[in-house]
């Protein structure tokens, strides 16, 4: 059945990311892409970003709107070890020991100096995800993380889902779009069995206010059945639990349906 939901702490070394974006024409860091990707991993409990924010005023509004705590790290002519790195590492270790329910740490940086921190978190049984730019992320850090996501791959396509009919009521279209986005997210996570409970959990991560009743369905199974009738997904029933599993997009012949 669906696995337990992970609890995430997301720690962003913005100074490092800014260096990665330096010189890239017409490209600006989009923190919402990161958060949208990470809600597919679990529930985000802590969100912090570290930088001398007086140098990045253009980004502050977007980070505030995303409810990310801005950790102000003034440079003050400091030389040697980056003070933002030190503060991020200290906060990570503090969270590791004081918030035992946080089982996954996301270090958004490509800096090899975080490799010892990653090792310490893993020693304490934490799952560590790294995220950074392809051309500025250290192989040492990449190889030490349990998994590493490149920023450039955040919108990697996973196939073309069917189009939703435009003439459907808005609430139904919204529900179907959220369903498709969630199935795409789970496929991207290489989930082999897409249980209905797993899909609903992902939908609520993406939109915490989601309720099938609001969209006109008595149960979540009713929503899935309607999506199948509309040619958006294919379902089968698990013989042990008698619950739905999504086995793909689009329609299939009646023969073998839900077998």
Set out the residue ranges of the language-model regions.
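Domain-level signal for Mg2+-assisted phosphodiester chemistry and nucleotide/NA-binding surfaces
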Residues: 1-97, 117-122, 127
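Short, glycine/polar-rich helix-capping loops at beta-to-alpha or helix-loop-helix junctions
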Residues: 56-60, 133-141
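Short, well-ordered beta-strand core segments
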Residues: 70, 105, 128, 148-149
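Basic nucleic-acid-binding interfaces
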Residues: 100
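Active-site histidine-anchored catalytic micro-motif
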Residues: 103-109, 116-117, 121-126, 131-132
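N-terminal regulatory modules in eukaryotic regulatory proteins
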Residues: 131, 161-259
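Contiguous mid-protein beta-loop-alpha structural module that forms a pocket-lining wall or clamp
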Residues: 137-156
């Amino acid at each position: 059945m669906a696995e337990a939901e992970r609890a995430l702490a997301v720690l962003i070394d913005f100074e490092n990311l800014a260096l990665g974006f330096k010189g890239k024409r017409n490209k600006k860091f989009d923190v919402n892409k990161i958060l949208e990707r990470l809600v597919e991993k679990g529930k985000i409990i802590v969100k912090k970003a570290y930088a001398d924010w007086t140098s990045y005023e253009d980004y502050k509004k977007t980070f505030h709107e995303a409810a990310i705590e801005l950790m102000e790290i003034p440079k003050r002519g400091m030389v040697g070890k980056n003070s933002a790195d030190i503060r991020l590492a200290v906060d990570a270790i503090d969270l590791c020991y004081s918030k035992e329910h946080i089982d996954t740490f996301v270090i958004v940086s490509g800096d090899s100096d975080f490799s010892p921190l990653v090792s310490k978190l893993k020693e304490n049984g934490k799952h560590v995800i790294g995220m950074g730019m392809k051309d500025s992320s250290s192989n040492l850090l990449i190889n030490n993380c349990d998994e590493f996501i490149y920023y450039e791959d955040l919108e990697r396509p996973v196939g073309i889902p069917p189009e939703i009919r435009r003439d459907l009521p808005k609430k139904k279209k919204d529900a179907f779009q959220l369903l498709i986005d969630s199935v795409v997210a789970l496929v991207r996570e290489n989930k082999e069995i897409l249980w209905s409970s797993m899909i609903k959990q992902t939908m609520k991560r993406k939109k915490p206010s989601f309720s099938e009743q609001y969209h006109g369905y008595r149960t979540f199974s009713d929503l899935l059945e309607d999506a199948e009738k509309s040619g958006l997904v294919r379902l089968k029933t698990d013989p042990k639990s008698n619950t739905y599993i999504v086995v793909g997009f689009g329609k299939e012949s009646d023969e073998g349906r839900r077998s």
